[in-house]
Amino acid sequence: MNYFAGEYDVAVVGAGHAGIEAALAAARLGCKTAIFTINMDAVGNCPCNPSIGGTAKGHLVREIDALGGKMGKTADECFLQSRMLNRGKGPAVHSLRAQIDRRKYSSVMKHKIELQKNLDLRQAEITDIEKTEGGYNLTTRMLAVFKCKTVIIATGTYLGGRIFVGEVSYESGPDGIFPAAFLGSSLKKLGLPLRRFKTGTPARVLKSSIDFSELEVQKGDEPPQPFSYETENLGENKVECHISWTNDETKQIILENINRSPLYAGKIEGVGPRYCPSFEDKIMRFKDKPRHQLFIEPCGLDTEEMYLQGMSSSLPEEVQLKFYHTIKGLEHCLIMRPAYAIEYDCVDPLAMNPTLEFKDFEGLFGAGQFNGSSGYEEAAAQGLVAGINAAMKVLGREPVIFDRSESYIGTLVDDLVTKGANEPYRMMTSRSEYRLVLRQDNADERLTPLGHRIGLISDERYEKFLKKQELKKEELNRLKSTVISPTDEVNEILVSRETSEITSGVRLIDLMKRPQLGYDALKNIDKTRPELDPNIFEQVEIGIKYEGYIQKQLKQVEQMKKLEVKQLPKDFDYNEIEGLRLEAREKLNKIKPLNIGQASRISGVSPADISVLLIWLAQNNRRQ
């Protein structure tokens, strides 16, 4: 028999990376919040790679931290090795990636939830979500009923989860944890547009069974950089990673056994991630490629498990062992956990507003892989957005919509709710048309004032941020006012850097504009340089060297914002507008964009359609 178990302002279903950020944000904003998980030992679990960040993902982590989220700080507390990716390219694509202790990360996140005021962590499987007059009733498998004003669904890959390893398949979530077996039918009954996606993970092998003498060593950066603006010193890297390569023999084993892959045998219906394919998928898609790289990464300091990055597979376990044994350094490796594919239910994100609230279900939000994305970082970013907006709804405050011109978080959400996701969506720097101004180094400058206004950034932290901005301004003024005289020492340094000598006094800022010169090259010339946070020097140097490009991109941002302020009616029938093409009418009626800017990014809506909309909007505004 069902029994009443309590009331909450915000209920979060799932305690993965999305659920955690959602619950912590809502609770910190003053809402009575509950976070439900099937297994409390899996809070903040990292069932795939033991790392946080990476290309574009590192940007998301910095932005989450700048807003007051917890992923970056927790990753710093659990870091094993840190590397800045894409250093050989421009600053727009520099991205931090850190190896983490996955068990410690889970434990630290769980403890943060337990300590958070206004937040209850509960082990319970939610089996039913029912719409009520004042919100939603959540029913658990133990028949407890919770009355909730708002609900955030963050079920990850657990919703209807099914594991595939060769000919074997069974219902399960990742890491052998029970799936959410009943909630999917409840959500379908409610009316949510569910579909099936698929992802996978590599095997874990025993460290002592690896011959590291055969492998290329991959060290971390020294000194390692943190994700969080609150972390002052990470210390030293604690581990090394290693690199190996597949070969023709590896490839041949895959080709001989491809019919045993459930993906190629047609047993998996879900759509897989384009940018994180299984190893057998790589072989089939890139048959001319002679070899593929893999990274061997530790899962923690208190475990002998090693993660084989780039070797996701759904082939039978004995086939996995065969092809691993063809790889240099892994000839005698022992599989501790086999690789597998997992299929799961997720929702069509076109059914959502940019707040991540469902258009047809007030007070119901989605976040993370449930929304059709992939990755821990994408999930955490959406969790923060959903948690903030669920709290805003409960508190009667204005919703917070993240603009794609101001953050990768905004780009991620806008892409999902405007363009949809026909496959697991992965964040990439190429998805942002404003990436030069959305760098990871200036995430605090872009988002910390917003985090403070919302209520997630403390006054103390905000004062530190303002002080940093003041120091940055002072440093820029110093570079403008400091003149370097043409001495033999100065010109010798300039020539050594393959740049022309000076014959008269030159400002430091003008020297800095030269491609060959930066803070490091000018350290023996710049006698009055103050002791500052390295991040300040980085931001100042980038601002100087890329000033023209940045100003050009800021003008593009302003042009787009002019379209973003042109609001469109929420429940309008676009069939009433003459001149719109049929495809445009169908897409506009389905997505219901909030403004002209969002409408312009919908696939199937042409510039000509936007012109028609602008004319109609001007006429409509005059009539009103």
Feature roles, as predicted:
Residues 3-7, 24-132, 142, 154-174, ...:
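Conserved N-terminal/central alpha/beta ligand/cofactor-binding core
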Residues 4-18:
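Beta1/beta-strand and adjacent pyrophosphate-binding region of the FAD-binding site
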Residues 13, 145-156:
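Short hydrophobic core segments
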Residues 39-41, 57, 84, 184-321, ...:
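An anion/pyrophosphate-binding glycine-rich loop and adjacent beta-alpha core
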Residues 307-373, 401-414, 533-587, 592:
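A glycine-rich dinucleotide-binding beta-alpha-beta segment and adjacent secondary-structure elements
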Residues 379-400:
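Internal hydrophobic alpha-helix adjacent to the cofactor/substrate pocket in enzyme cavities
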Residues 431, 437, 448-453, 457-609, ...:
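Extended, charge-enriched "interface" segments that sit outside catalytic cores
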